[in-house]
A protein has these predicted regions:
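Membrane-proximal, non-transmembrane interface segments of integral membrane proteins
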Residues: 1-51
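Long amphipathic all-alpha helical oligomerization modules
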Residues: 51-155
Length: 155
């Protein structure tokens, strides 16, 4: 049967974008060391506490360095939460795709399968919102927000 629908294209497109986001998040998390950032903050705070009165230029510089490193640490924490969400969403969508595939194998009504695909695709709003927030990692930007026609051939 022909199961090509915009809903299936959307489902597959979201899955591919999540895979790409997951790859970027994983690479970022592998390359960023929270312990090193925490140690850097401690060292900077120690240096600042040892400054003598009247050395405001150095104090401002160290304060800014502490704030910047703190932002990097917070960004790392956000990336950890995002990676967990993306991983859960990948598992969830993969399960949905498998369930839809199993329905198709069991020769259920194409109209029923299409309605199920469309229902799953319609429930992707939160996932798509998360993907938009992760555009800085995916590099996909706004240009490919709409799902392309992924399935151009009959299944």
């Amino acid at each position: 049967e022909d199961l090509r629908t915009p809903g299936l294209d959307k489902l597959l497109w979201v899955f591919l974008r999540l895979l790409y986001s997951h790859q970027g998040l994983t690479r970022f998390l592998d390359e960023t060391d929270a312990t090193a950032l925490e140690k850097q903050i401690d060292k900077l705070e120690q240096r600042r506490s040892k400054l003598v009165q009247g050395n405001e230029r150095l104090r401002k510089s160290l304060t800014d360095a502490i704030a910047t490193t703190g932002m990097r640490l917070e960004n790392l924490r956000n990336a950890e939460r995002n990676a967990e969400f993306v991983s859960l969403e990948l598992d969830r969508i993969q399960s949905k795709i498998l369930a839809l595939s199993e329905m198709a194998v069991n020769n259920q009504s194409p109209d029923f399968i299409t309605s199920q695909v469309d229902a799953v695709a319609a429930g992707m709003a939160e996932t798509e919102s998360a993907i938009k927030e992760l555009n800085y990692i995916t590099g996909l930007g706004e240009t490919l927000e709409e799902a392309p026609s992924i399935l151009e051939r009959s299944i």
